[in-house]
Amino acid sequence: MQTQVLFEHPLNEKMRTWLRIEFLIQQLTVNLPIVDHAGALHFFRNVSELLDVFERGEVRTELLKELDRQQRKLQTWIGVPGVDQSRIEALIQQLKAAGSVLISAPRIGQFLREDRLIALVRQRLSIPGGCCSFDLPTLHIWLHLPQAQRDSQVETWIASLNPLTQALTMVLDLIRQSAPFRKQTSLNGFYQDNGGDADLLRLNLLLDSQLYPQISGHKSRFAIRFMPLDTENGQVPERLDFELACC
């Protein structure tokens, strides 16, 4: 079976922000438990970038709007023959619950911003080599605490993001499932189409092609140019089949 590679591209600013947040939250747990300096810096750097993203926009407001929009979309399926009504009703209740938790939660990221260790590390991350033991003795001693103590603190930090994580996961899952993949063909490495008010493009490419897409556009129209990974010797076929979902 041939291996496919999935590419996703946002068609508006809110989706761009959501995908970045999703990526950074996933990165928080990749190297757990934290057992050394490298793992600690990976964790704190992603926390710092998350807080930077939170400060740039109304993440909570946009998510609450999307939770409401998804509920309205699901309500249009109530009573439609052949549709699993219990599943629809369960999803609506889950969206309502996620919205209630999110709206009553403290400011997103505030718990992390107020943590002394996180604040100290954030100040040093932009300095080359700025997290050495003599620059950050606080981090140095933290890394020598019992593993269980560090694990507990990390779990508390990550848990503070749960209201956001749960709402974002639901929203992105529903958006990704909102459109099926369809076979498309590019000509001379180029493809364009109308977005139909989509928020997200999802594209499957065969790994064997060693091509990647450069995508530009917005929700009403987009263009895809396929580029070879090997810029000197790679070739783009005259006709290239791929799978595309406009979600």
Swiss-Prot record:
Query: Which InterPro entries does the entry link to?
Result: ZapD, ZapD_C, ZapD_sf
Q: Which Pfam families match?
A: ZapD
What is the top-level taxon of the source organism? Bacteria
Keywords for this protein: Cell cycle, Cell division, Cytoplasm, Septation
> Major place of localization?
cytoplasm
Report the locations given in the UniProt record.
Cytoplasm
Q: Does the keyword Cytoplasm apply?
A: yes
* CC annotations in GO: cell division site; cytoplasm
User: What's an example Gene Ontology biological process for this entry?
Assistant: FtsZ-dependent cytokinesis
Assembly behavior? Interacts with FtsZ.
This chain's function reads: Cell division factor that enhances FtsZ-ring assembly. Directly interacts with FtsZ and promotes bundling of FtsZ protofilaments, with a reduction in FtsZ GTPase activity.
Name the protein family: Belongs to the ZapD family.
Identify this protein by name. Answer: Cell division protein ZapD
Q: What organism is this sequence from?
A: Escherichia coli O139:H28 (strain E24377A / ETEC)
